[in-house]
Amino acid sequence: MDINLYDYRINIKTAGPSLQGNLRSELYFAGCKKAEEGDPCRGCFNYELWQREQGSHVSIQSIVNRLEEMCSVKSVTIVGGEPTDQLDGLIELCKLLKKYNYHILVISWHTYEDMLRDDKEKYEQLFDTIDVLVDGQYDEHQRIYDDTHTNVMRSFIGSNNQKVIDLNKYSLDNKTIVAYNNINQYEDMYIKKDGGVGFNGSNH
């Protein structure tokens, strides 16, 4: 199975927290149906990722092989575009990444609740393989993203309306999640030793 992939970045510090000095690699899925249909998230600035034809079809095994060759850490963030527009491929990619012991973070404009309403069986397979989901539409009026900031949380999350959902203890038999709202109340975010999510301090 292939993924329509726009690009990837290796060993960067702007793709979320990790246990390895906040280094992660990032995979950019090409295409966002919401944007292509004329209804992008308000203020979305990833224009080059909207169009599916901007990507190249790459096999899932080739993607993992490239990460294994080039990554110094086993932490990966999957963004778009919209990764869940390629849901079957996303699930298979995450299953393979998990076999290689990667910590997986996925960012989607779809909410967790909408995902379950849309295709409960498939999304539960996805949740069973990933560690963290950042969900919800980007809203420029609630922007917290700052690519000049040394703060890890603000270097990869777009706006305060988005939720951080800890799926580290989720399984098909034990559907445990912990959801964090209003994340701007926290100073920063980190990954616990067990792979779950933690937050530092409060801005209030």
List PLM regions with ranges:
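P-loop/Walker A phosphate-binding loop and immediately adjacent motor/lid segment at beta-alpha junctions
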Residues: 85-95, 143-201
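Short gly/pro-enriched beta-turn/loop segments at secondary-structure junctions
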Residues: 20-22, 71, 99
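Canonical Radical SAM [4Fe-4S] cluster-binding loop centered on the CxxxCxxC motif
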Residues: 3-5, 10-58
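Core AdoMet radical
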Residues: 42-58, 72-86, 100-118, 127-165
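Short, acidic/polar
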Residues: 63, 116-123
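Short, charged beta->alpha transition segments
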Residues: 60-68
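Alpha-helical scaffolding segments of alpha/beta enzyme cores, especially the outer helices
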Residues: 62, 88, 92-99, 125
